[in-house]
Amino acid sequence: MTEPLVLMFSGIYGGANGLNQIDPANSKALETLQQMQPQIGQQLQGFASLYWGGIGGTSGPPYAGLVICLFALIGLSSVTNQHRWWISATIIFSFMLSAGIYFEAFNVFMFDHLPLYNKFRAPSMIMIIPTLLLGIMALYGMAAISSETDFKAVLKKYKPSFIVTGLILATVFYIYFTSSFKSESEINLLSQIAKIPDANQKAAFETPANDLVNAIVTDRKSLIEGDIVKFFLFLGLVITLVFLAIKKVINQTVLLVAFRILS
């Protein structure tokens, strides 16, 4: 149910299948595979995937962007935005549809009754809708912020968006500190190896498999750590730019160009 967080934190669930989301020079999983005996490594390399979310596999997350999401939340909390309610409802509805088996009763009903929904190859395809709507809302947010003249008023006016941002960040930290970072396939692999009756065959696979899974976990943690660092960096830059614009150190054109670059 927390998979939509990939819109804002692309690496929270590993990003994509394989090991391409991380620099090969820094990949502990790749290093571990290279140190294995060739025969063992060939049989285990199929399990070397950074993605550990709930949709089985993916070529990449529907990443909207940190800055886009931050401004989208501001746009959705703007009282002058006449479209915020139906867009908010559509985004939430899309999240519910994308949950698939994690919200099974609802999705089975939608599959049977929502026109054309049964033509989708996977429930996650619906994520293209919130990605588009967040981009539209980000434009509202940028326009709203760029017209402000009082920094304290900004903090008060858009307080709901800051609260939601804080809750999202708290959820990310909760996932980071409480998750095993192991996929279902890896748990099944270790379980199957533990059940091998032949002691020699079991010994040949058990240590390499555990080493590989632990290395993949390390890589996954490094991805989410990088996302968290990027979040605070981009948040700091956005706050600084807004403050400078309100104080007339930079004009609105420079502010909007800077927002576009960060996005």
Segments predicted by a language model, with ranges:
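Contiguous transmembrane helix-bundle modules in multi-pass membrane proteins
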Residues: 82-263
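Periplasmic/ER-lumenal interhelical loops and adjacent helix-loop junctions
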Residues: 1-71, 75, 177-232
